[in-house]
């Protein structure tokens, strides 16, 4: 039985059909539609008794060559700020003093509703009982100077940022269809360090190795760029082909043994 979360109400019936022999398999996944609203799935308890995770957005409007998320998750759908703040108040009342705002495309929050991430963080910081706010992964090209200025003015925001890189080679970034260069990435990272204070801020990132067409020189360029950025932590993982993405059919696929070496 394969079903989407939007059809979870029918999962017992679907399983029963298979058990009864009415069906050998059930695939019940409905595609996301443009204009679809954010699906509310609030949580009030977490394994960590002080830190809670609050999802504020789903979907992605980008078309990175390697990524299947837009196809699987649909377009950007922002959760209403009223709903988010209500959940934060419930969490604070339950003893959670730290929240992590998460999303599929966090900087896209509010792009479909006329608001924005910086505004949400400002309002979240005003919730009584919430003492620390952390952010999920951020795309460098979607952080404006005004966003950085406003975020730096929120004392409750922890200055630890996961700034997605994917490659330290501008050539590879173009092939990936990422909308920034390494120079632009470095400029945003520098602005974060300046705004929050070099001694206070920490930046982590992720890097894909073995993307189709990546040469030894591209790899060396990527390594050199990463080394120069003074990241607190780098999550490195090999490129994995995803059927239905443009990169799946790209020429010059890198052999698996090279990716792992």
Residue ranges, per PLM feature:
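Short acidic, glycine/proline-rich loop/turn micro-motifs
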Residues: 173-176, 246-250
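Short low-complexity, flexible loop/linker segments enriched in glycine and/or proline
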Residues: 19, 114-116, 249-251
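Pocket-edge positions in alpha/beta enzyme catalytic cores
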Residues: 3, 75-76, 112, 177, ...
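Conserved SAM/AdoMet-binding glycine-rich loop
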Residues: 93-216
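Proteins enriched for Cys/Gly/acidic motifs involved in redox and nucleic-acid/cofactor modification
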Residues: 1-109, 144-146, 151, 157, ...
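Terminal RNA-binding accessory module
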Residues: 249-261
């Amino acid at each position: 039985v394969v079903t989407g979360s939007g059809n979870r109400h029918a999962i017992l019936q679907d399983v029963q059909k298979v058990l009864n022999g009415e069906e050998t398999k059930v695939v019940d996944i409905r595609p996301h539609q443009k204009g679809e609203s954010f699906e509310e799935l609030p949580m009030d308890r977490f394994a960590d008794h002080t830190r809670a995770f609050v999802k504020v957005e789903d979907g992605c409007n980008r078309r990175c060559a390697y990524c299947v998320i837009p196809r699987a998750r649909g377009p950007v759908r922002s959760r209403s700020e009223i709903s988010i703040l209500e959940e934060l108040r419930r969490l604070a009342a339950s003893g959670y003093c730290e929240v992590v705002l998460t999303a599929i495309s966090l900087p896209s929050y509010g792009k479909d509703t006329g608001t924005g991430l910086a505004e949400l963080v400002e309002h979240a910081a005003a919730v009584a009982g919430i003492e620390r706010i952390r952010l999920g992964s951020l795309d460098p090209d979607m952080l404006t100077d005004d966003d950085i200025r406003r975020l730096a003015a929120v004392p409750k925001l922890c200055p630890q940022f996961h700034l997605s890189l994917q490659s330290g080679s501008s050539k590879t970034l173009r092939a990936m269809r990422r909308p920034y260069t390494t120079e632009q990435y470095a400029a945003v990272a520098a602005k974060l360090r300046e705004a929050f204070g070099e001694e206070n801020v920490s930046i982590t990132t992720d890097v894909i190795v073995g993307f189709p067409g990546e040469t030894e020189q591209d790899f060396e360029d990527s390594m050199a760029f990463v080394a120069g950025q003074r990241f607190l932590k780098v999550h490195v993982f090999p490129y994995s082909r995803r059927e239905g993405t443009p990169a799946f059919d790209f020429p010059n696929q890198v052999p698996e043994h090279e990716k792992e070496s």
